[in-house]
Amino acid sequence: MKFPLLLALLVGGAFALHLSSEASDSKSPLVDESLPREAEISRPEVEESPPGEQLMSLEEEEEEEEEEGSGSEGALGNEGAVSGQDVTDENLQSPKEEDTTSLMGDSGFKTGRYLLVRRPECFNKAQLVCRSCYRGTLASIHSFSVNFRIQSFVRGINQGQVWIGGRIVGWGRCKRFRWIDGSSWNFAYWAAGQPRRGGGRCVTLCTRGGHWRRSGCGKRRPFICAY
């Protein structure tokens, strides 16, 4: 009586073990297929800078290096000092009276007086004229109202742009805009696409619209002195 019962228990145990083994084998392919998905989910994402911005920056650097290397622009130090290689105080000629127009006594310019010099000069020489002849500097602009009034002041001349006192100092990632008189760069009125798509290290004001543009510092333009 005991032997048939023992035999039945042994057969039942072997059958249960066989079913467990088949179930384990049938699940293993699903586990293997899921492993790559887990790896992909856990892999950290890497952010990359937009290629257009990177290429644009490289193009700007190449343009500036070409301009500086050609000698067409005077060297501007990190503090905005004017180079004396091209002109000195001794051989500087003051602009003729008919080449200048003064804007003073206007309620819109309580912080200073402005002078338009129509005789075109490069940026460095324009700054030297402002400093030596009028004891001032190329104009710095800190509000839209002043920018608008200066643009209204110069829009009648037969030139598209005039120098103001903004320029780039530093190189590469350390580049920044500064006013040549040392005042805070707390306002800007750039034209569309500027300053990123502009070339040159000096800043002009457009006589139509009053927007600002970057320009090669060696170009000769009329300019605005503040004193």
UniProtKB/Swiss-Prot annotation:
Gene3D superfamilies noted in UniProt: Mannose-Binding Protein A, subunit A (3.10.100.10)
Glycan-modified residues: 24, 70
Q: What's any one GO cellular component for it?
A: extracellular region
List all Basic and acidic residues biased stretches: 34-46
Annotated region described as Disordered, given as residue ranges: 21-105
Q: How is it modified after translation?
A: Nitrated.
Outline the extent of the C-type lectin domain. Answer: 128-227
Q: Could you say which residues form the signal peptide?
A: 1-16
Q: Does the keyword Disulfide bond apply?
A: yes
SS bond list: 130-225, 202-217
Compartmental location: Secreted
Keyword annotations for this protein, in alphabetical order, are: Antibiotic, Antimicrobial, Disulfide bond, Glycoprotein, Immunity, Lectin, Nitration, Proteoglycan, Secreted, Signal
Q: Where is the composition biased (Acidic residues)?
A: 58-70
SMART domains the UniProt entry points to: CLECT
Per the record, the domain of life is Eukaryota
Q: Which GO terms describe its biological process?
A: defense response to bacterium; defense response to nematode; immune response; negative regulation of interleukin-10 production; negative regulation of macrophage cytokine production; positive regulation of interleukin-4 production
| Residue ranges the record assigns to the propeptide | 17-110
Function in brief:
Cytotoxin and helminthotoxin. MBP also induces non-cytolytic histamine release from basophils. It is involved in antiparasitic defense mechanisms and immune hypersensitivity reactions.
Q: What is this protein called?
A: Bone marrow proteoglycan
Write down the species.
Rattus norvegicus
Gene name, per UniProt, is Prg2
